[in-house]
């Protein structure tokens, strides 16, 4: 086993840490030292180390009907709960997009549930209609579980499903539905959702197509510390398989589980936020995921001050002002920023804010 200083050097030199080395970082590294090493790595891999990027987009849910039965989600309803059903209409999309454009937004983050009746044709028609009306808006839409679900009910392979979605206007694929990429955890918190292997397969296929993607982690529920590390290693290894010149994962975004009103809470699993733990996750992620350039601080779930600290601990992006967000908010996340507020928070942390697009290019 390498000493901590040797593990740091290995990461800085571009080496892929072993599971044991990553666990040693997470378990043993003094937090201040870990954060400093992560910040040094951030400075060496981003284009401008004095800049922190941010975005204006809108998160619109296609539907709240979902068959996955995730124990951490308050937002969904079952197919038989017809009094709560909704499917967003084109008119509603247009109203939301018009407001987003007024606020300077350039991207629609489209996510929803695993609706048993919404197959590939529904999403093709939706994407084409949105692109015909708003050709300059980027569609950052769905997620690996939704792609797998659409493929299943449409009688297609996931690869063919991705190809048809891209042809219809899909610009990039969010990292939604990762949670913790460990089978033990997934079988408990989201037993009906596509498996770890399916999530990985869809993302790998997206990478082979050169479709930009992101990766996420929702932590702080039933997973162990080492299962968090296993999650990071799985993402890192998947990124290592991306063909040279292809996008792969353009960002990693971890956030804490919010338990209010969820089925997990009713079973005694309550979120306990620790700023120090979050900083340790951000710093460890930077050193383990040394092949992913961008790491986002999740101000929505951890708040302004902790997110600002994360910018000195490996994170280089402050995310979006989130004109609309329903899923995490429904479980207790209540932090908010407007465009001026998010820029001021970045300046207070000692950085220059720069508005970006989904590919992390300055706007």
Question: What kind of feature is each model-predicted range?
Answer:
Residues 52-58, 108, 139-143, 173-175, ...:
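Hydrophobic faces of well-ordered beta-strands that scaffold small-molecule active sites
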Residues 54-60, 81, 109-121, 183, ...:
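Glycine-rich, proline-tolerant flexible connector loops at the mouths of alpha/beta enzymes
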Residues 50-56, 66, 71-82, 127-132, ...:
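Mobile, glycine- and charge-enriched loop segments
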Residues 14, 38, 70, 110, ...:
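Conserved, mostly hydrophobic/aromatic
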Residues 35-79, 85-111:
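N-terminal pre-triad scaffold of radical SAM enzymes
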Residues 1-32, 101, 232-233, 240-363:
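Auxiliary Fe-S-binding modules of radical SAM enzymes
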Residues 22-25, 56-59, 112-116, 219-222, ...:
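Conserved short loop/turn motifs at secondary-structure junctions
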Residues 77-216, 220-237:
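Conserved Radical SAM active-site core
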């Amino acid at each position: 086993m390498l000493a901590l200083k040797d593990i740091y050097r290995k990461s800085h030199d571009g080496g892929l840490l072993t599971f044991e080395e990553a666990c040693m970082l997470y378990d043993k590294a003094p937090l201040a030292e870990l954060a400093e090493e992560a910040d040094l790595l951030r400075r060496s891999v981003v284009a401008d180390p004095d800049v922190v990027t941010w975005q204006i987009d809108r998160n619109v849910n296609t539907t709240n009907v979902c068959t996955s039965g995730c124990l951490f989600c308050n937002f969904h309803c079952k197919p038989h709960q017809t009094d709560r059903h909704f499917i967003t209409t084109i008119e509603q999309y247009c109203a939301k997009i018009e407001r987003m454009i007024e606020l300077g937004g350039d991207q629609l983050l489209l996510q929803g549930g695993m609706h048993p009746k919404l197959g590939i044709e529904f999403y093709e028609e939706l994407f084409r209609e949105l692109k015909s009306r708003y050709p300059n808006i980027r569609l950052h839409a769905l997620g690996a579980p939704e792609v797998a679900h659409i493929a299943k009910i449409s009688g297609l392979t996931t690869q063919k499903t991705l190809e048809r979605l891209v042809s219809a206007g899909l610009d990039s694929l969010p990292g939604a539905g990762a949670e913790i990429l460990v089978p033990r955890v997934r079988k408990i918190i989201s037993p009906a959702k596509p498996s770890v292997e399916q999530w990985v397969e869809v993302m790998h296929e997206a990478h082979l197509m050169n479709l930009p993607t992101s990766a996420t982690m929702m932590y702080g529920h039933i997973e162990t510390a080492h299962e968090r590390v296993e999650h990071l290693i799985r993402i890192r290894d998947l990124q290592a398989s991306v063909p040279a010149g292809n996008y792969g994962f353009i960002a990693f975004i971890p956030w804490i589980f919010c338990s209010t009103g969820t089925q997990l809470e009713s079973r005694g699993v309550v979120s306990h936020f620790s700023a120090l733990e979050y900083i340790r996750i951000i710093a460890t992620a930077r050193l383990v995921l040394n092949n992913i350039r961008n790491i986002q601080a999740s101000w929505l779930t951890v708040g302004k001050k902790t997110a600002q600290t994360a910018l000195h601990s490996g994170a280089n992006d402050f995310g979006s002002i989130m004109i609309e967000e329903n899923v995490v908010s429904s479980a207790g996340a209540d932090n908010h920023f407007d465009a001026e507020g998010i820029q001021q928070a970045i300046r207070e942390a000692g950085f220059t804010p720069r508005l970006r697009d989904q590919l992390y290019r300055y706007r």
